[in-house]
């Protein structure tokens, strides 16, 4: 209760102070209304405002519609109106329909190659390149290769280009030793394979002989060891036999002496 009373007294004192300040008419204090009201009724030279309206070049705005006209979606596109729309029936306006036809662009074909030394795949589809009765028909240009040449190659013959044609480039048929290029490589591969097989056979034979020799030495040592043990056993047993025979002989009483004969 004490807190509520103190708060109420503070609010009351603040309200009284505000009323006293307004009644005193002190214009020197800070007031937000001073920023809104004009402090002087005399306008200064710089208070004049100049308004400039700039119209879009080449564009005329359509006249305003009379009141009572219906809703027209064309009003949203007034900026694109050039002022040439005709009034429609019932106060409404219609758009002028414009039909635009777009033609397909004409493509220009590249001119045919007039050089006779260049290779052209289109020559294979030209019937004029085929031979007729052993004679070649005149060609428009390109190469001198035709279906007849393919038939000659498949039939076991060799390709013979036309004389006087071609750019004189180097071919594989010009070098008689071109077919021998692959033979040295093949011979080298076969020779290396045979050498590796021979080396493997020799090494395996040597290892087999070494193992055989080692086993033979081991068997000889075992035989000598067995023989040595047998000899030692014989030597150890013979003295015992002799000793036993001597011992038996000494155990017998000596025979009585024979009487002397006269």
Swiss-Prot record:
GO terms for cellular component: adherens junction; cell surface; extracellular region; focal adhesion; plasma membrane. Keywords: Cell adhesion, Cell junction, Cell membrane, Glycoprotein, Membrane, Proteoglycan, Secreted, Signal, Transmembrane, Transmembrane helix. Residues 38-181 are annotated as: Disordered. Residues 49-60, 98-119 have a biased composition (Low complexity). O-glycosylated. Glycans are attached at residue 178. Detected in cerebrospinal fluid (at protein level). Expressed in many tissues, with low expression in thymus. The keyword Glycoprotein applies. PANTHER family: CD99 ANTIGEN-LIKE PROTEIN 2, CD99/MIC2 PROTEIN RELATED. This is CD99 antigen-like protein 2. Belongs to the CD99 family. InterPro entries: CD99L2. Residues 26-185 are extracellular. It is found in: Cell membrane; Cell junction; Secreted. It is a single-pass type I membrane protein. One of its GO terms (biological process) is diapedesis. The gene is CD99L2. It holds the Pfam family CD99L2. Coiled coil: none annotated. Its main location: membrane. The chain crosses the membrane at residues 186-206. Plays a role in a late step of leukocyte extravasation helping cells to overcome the endothelial basement membrane. Acts at the same site as, but independently of, PECAM1. Homophilic adhesion molecule, but these interactions may not be required for cell aggregation. Residues 1-25 form the signal peptide. Residues 125-136, 159-168 have a biased composition (Basic and acidic residues).
